[in-house]
Amino acid sequence: MVEIKVIHGDITKMTVDAIVNAANTSLLGGGGVDGAIHRAAGPALLAACRPLHGCATGEAKITPGFRLPAKYVIHTPGPVWQGGQHNELQLLANSYRNSLNLAAENHCQTVAFPSISTGVYHFPLSIAAPLALKTLQATAQTTAHTVQTITIVCFDDQTQNVFSTALAALTN
């Protein structure tokens, strides 16, 4: 059984097999968690991302973690919220699902996720958190032979509260 937990913290300091980066489609760094991961990993991360030639929204690509405590960084561009009528829910679910599957393919037992798309991409946290957790729980059924622990690392108290409430509702 895969354990899913929610914590408040800094994803760049997580000692796990893989952290997930809420990237942009260029994979060349940006703001928010993407910028923080690139700064913490060092310039080798950008050099490793260049030959990947970007990544489509909802898809995932993997690089080494370089100076991070994590062995790998899994990059996934989440969708920009446009009111919910532009396939955003499916694209966000794809980001979580494809990232977890890629982690399993690379023999990762521990994976840390940020709250994808809820920052500058304005995805409503009240929709994103339950969707993320349901997707991860369902995907974990097929990756349980590899992935053992999934940690949602929340940057602030509000995000942690919403994810914790959604996780409690899902497990009850």
Curated annotation (Swiss-Prot):
Cited SUPFAM superfamilies: Macro domain-like
PROSITE patterns linked to this entry: MACRO (PS51154)
Top-level taxon of origin: Bacteria
Pfam families named among the record's database cross-references: Macro
Name under which the protein is recorded: Macro domain-containing protein lp_3408
SMART domains per the UniProt record, alphabetical: A1pp
Domain Macro, chain residue ranges per copy: 1-171
Protein family per UniProt: Belongs to the MacroD-type family.
